[in-house]
C-alpha cells in the first residue's frame, strides 16, 4: 500500500520504544508441524506494521504465507525488535524480509550473510524511495542497502539525541552492505502504477519466470546490478517510460533511465556461497487485502492492494519460493552457466558517497 507521509510524531516515539518480546517466534504459525518440514521465517522485528504497512503472515501477507504452506513449508514469524541473529535463523530454510522500516544492526547483517553463505535463502521486499512508514528518516530501501540517502558518512545525520541514542540506532553502521555482499542495490527511484511484460525467459531465470507473462507495480523501485558475477535481473520495467509514469509523490525525477534494462530490474536474484537471495522493489506485488492492524495515527483500518492475485504476481512468487528452496552447489552466478548481466548504469548521485537527500525527512 502506498501512503503519503501523514503519521504524527507520536509514532516515532512509539517505534523507538518497542518492547522486545522474549520469545523469538510469534504464535501466529497455524500449520501442523513435524520434524520433516522446513521453515520459512518472516521478519517482523523491523517495524513491518508501521503506518499503512501490514506485512505479517496473518495480515496483508497472508496469501503469500499460505502459498508457502501449500508448498509444504512451516511458516513462522520473527517478532521483537531487531531480532535477526545466528540463533533466530538456525531452524529457517528461507528468511523473508518485508519492508524493514528500521535499519539492520551490524550483527544482524553478519547473521544474514552467514545464513546465506551456509545454504539459507533470503528475500528482500522493498518499496519506492520515501516510503518511510514510521518517520524515523530511514525507509526500507535505505535499511536494506545499508546507508541513508544523503547521510552515507553518518546514518544519524540530523537526528536529535533521543533518536541517535535509541535502541533502534544502537550498533547501526552505515555501509554499502547489500551491494558489497549480494551484488545489487535498491535504487532510490519511485515509479507509479505499471504492468510489465519485460520478463527474462524461463531458461535464463532458472525457471522462476515460467508461466509468468505480466507483473504489476503500484509505486515501487528497481534495483541496480552492481556485480553481475553475483546477481541477475529477471523482471524489468517496460521500455520508454515517460515522466508521467513516475509515482506522483516522487521527490526527484522518479524514473532514472527511462525504464527497460537501464532502469535496473524490478525483481532480481543473487547467488553467494551455498545459498541464494531474491529482491523485489515493491511490496504491492506481494500484499493482499486482509490487513490485520489499524493505523496508529488515526485508528482507521489500513488499505492494502490485492497484489498477490494481480497479473501473474502469485505465480512469480510461487516460482521464487520453489527456487529459493532448492540447494545448489554453485557459489556465484558466474558458475551457474547462464549469460551474465551488465552492470546497471548509475547516475552520479547514486554513488553512496555522492548521494543527496532531495527533501528533508521526516
Task: Cite the ranges covered by each PLM segment.
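Short alpha-helical segments and helix-capping/turn motifs at coil-helix boundaries
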Residues: 20, 108-109, 262-265
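Sec-dependent signal peptide cleavage junction
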Residues: 18-32
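Bacterial N-terminal signal peptides that target proteins for export
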Residues: 1-10
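An acidic, glycine-rich "communication" segment
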Residues: 129-255
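Bacterial N-terminal signal peptides
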Residues: 10-19
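Long alpha-helical segments found as membrane-embedded helices
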Residues: 29-167, 277, 282-287, 294-362
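A glycine-centered loop/beta-turn motif at secondary-structure junctions
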Residues: 195-335
Amino acid at each position: 500500500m502506498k501512503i503519503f507521509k501523514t503519521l504524527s510524531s507520536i509514532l516515532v516515539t512509539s517505534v523507538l520504544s518497542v518492547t522486545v518480546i522474549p520469545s523469538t517466534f510469534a504464535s501466529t504459525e497455524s500449520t501442523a508441524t513435524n520434524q520433516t518440514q522446513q521453515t520459512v521465517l518472516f521478519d517482523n522485528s523491523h517495524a513491518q506494521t508501521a503506518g499503512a504497512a501490514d506485512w505479517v503472515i496473518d495480515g496483508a501477507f497472508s496469501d503469500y504465507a499460505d502459498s508457502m504452506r501449500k508448498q509444504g513449508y512451516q511458516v513462522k514469524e520473527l517478532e521483537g525488535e531487531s531480532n535477526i541473529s545466528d540463533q533466530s535463523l538456525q531452524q529457517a530454510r528461507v528468511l523473508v524480509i518485508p519492508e524493514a522500516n528500521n535499519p539492520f544492526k551490524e550483527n544482524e547483517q553478519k547473521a544474514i550473510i552467514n545464513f546465506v553463505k551456509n545454504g539459507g535463502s533470503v528475500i528482500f521486499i522493498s518499496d519506492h524511495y520515501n516510503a518511510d512508514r514510521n518517520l524515523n528518516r530511514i525507509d526500507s530501501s535505505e535499511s536494506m542497502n545499508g546507508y541513508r540517502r544523503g547521510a552515507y558518512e553518518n546514518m544519524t545525520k540530523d537526528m536529535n539525541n533521543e533518536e541517535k541514542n535509541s535502541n533502534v540506532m544502537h550498533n547501526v553502521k552505515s555501509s554499502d552492505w547489500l551491494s558489497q555482499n549480494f551484488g545489487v542495490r535498491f535504487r532510490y527511484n519511485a515509479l507509479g502504477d505499471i504492468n510489465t511484460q519485460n520478463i527474462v525467459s524461463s531458461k535464463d531465470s532458472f525457471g522462476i519466470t515460467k508461466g509468468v507473462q505480466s507483473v504489476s507495480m503500484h509505486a515501487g523501485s528497481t534495483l541496480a546490478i552492481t556485480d553481475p558475477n553475483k546477481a541477475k535481473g529477471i523482471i524489468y520495467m517496460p521500455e520508454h517510460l515517460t515522466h508521467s509514469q513516475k509515482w506522483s509523490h516522487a521527490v526527484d525525477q522518479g524514473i532514472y533511465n527511462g525504464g527497460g534494462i537501464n532502469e535496473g530490474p524490478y525483481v532480481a536474484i543473487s547467488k553467494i556461497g551455498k545459498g541464494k537471495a531474491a529482491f523485489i522493489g515493491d511490496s504491492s506485488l506481494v500484499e493482499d487485502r486482509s490487513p490485520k492492524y489499524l493505523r496508529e495515527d488515526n485508528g482507521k483500518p489500513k488499505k492494502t492492494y490485492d497484489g498477490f492475485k494481480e497479473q501473474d504476481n502469485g505465480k512469480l512468487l510461487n516460482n521464487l519460493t520453489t527456487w529459493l528452496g532448492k540447494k545448489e552447489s554453485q557459489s556465484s552466478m558466474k558458475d551457474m552457466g547462464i549469460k551474465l548481466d551488465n552492470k546497471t548504469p548509475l547516475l552520479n548521485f547514486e554513488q553512496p558517497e555522492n548521494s543527496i537527500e532531495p527533501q528533508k525527512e521526516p
